[in-house]
Amino acid sequence: MPNHIVLYQPEIPANTGNISRTCAGTDTYLHLIRPLGFSTDDKMLKRAGLDYWDNVKLSYYDSLDEFFEKNEGGEFYYITKFGRHVYSDIDYSDPNKDYFFVFGKETTGLPDALLQKNEENCLRIPMTDHIRSLNLSNTAAILAYEALRQQNFGALLQEPNYDRKIFQD
């Protein structure tokens, strides 16, 4: 049931760091397509990802073409405020499929040509017209958890597993 978050030319290190932490916590693959708007040594990137970077299944690509060549056979969904379909109306429940959620730059989104070519797989998250967009890391988390919800949360812990006990049995 591999789920994948794909960031096309991300610009803000804290967003990518937050997304990496979500990926580590959900066993979701993270794909970064260059150029990145920051160095992978950036303090903000590392701080947002905390000490979870070793648990992130991370791949880098030099272009969209390279990404698609190396990831054939999955279902690709392009997240854009222009999408004709709401993300929650799609079925992500098949455990034998790879689901790729592709996000664009924080400032400009995904290339128009890519969206036009894949119009039927363009998804949006409903929001008011009071803002231009939702935060990238929040949006990635929404998609990751919707896919996991439909997959009954896969191998994620169904019960709390903490050293500290708050509630009595």
UniProtKB/Swiss-Prot annotation:
Pfam families: SpoU_methylase. Its main location: cytoplasm. It is found in: Cytoplasm. S-adenosyl-L-methionine binds at residues 79, 104, 125, 133. It catalyses: cytidine(34) in tRNA + S-adenosyl-L-methionine = 2'-O-methylcytidine(34) in tRNA + S-adenosyl-L-homocysteine + H(+); 5-carboxymethylaminomethyluridine(34) in tRNA(Leu) + S-adenosyl-L-methionine = 5-carboxymethylaminomethyl-2'-O-methyluridine(34) in tRNA(Leu) + S-adenosyl-L-homocysteine + H(+). Its EC number is 2.1.1.207. One of its GO terms (biological process) is wobble position ribose methylation. GO terms for molecular function: RNA binding; tRNA (5-carboxymethylaminomethyluridine(34)-2'-O)-methyltransferase activity; tRNA (cytidine(34)-2'-O)-methyltransferase activity. GO terms for cellular component: cytoplasm. Keywords: Cytoplasm, Methyltransferase, S-adenosyl-L-methionine, Transferase, tRNA processing. The keyword S-adenosyl-L-methionine applies. It is an enzyme of class 2 (transferase). PANTHER family: TRNA (CYTIDINE(34)-2'-O)-METHYLTRANSFERASE. Belongs to the class IV-like SAM-binding methyltransferase superfamily. RNA methyltransferase TrmH family. TrmL subfamily. Could methylate the ribose at the nucleotide 34 wobble position in tRNA. This is Putative tRNA (cytidine(34)-2'-O)-methyltransferase. It comes from Listeria monocytogenes serotype 4b (strain F2365). The lineage of its organism: Bacteria, Bacillati, Bacillota, Bacilli, Bacillales.
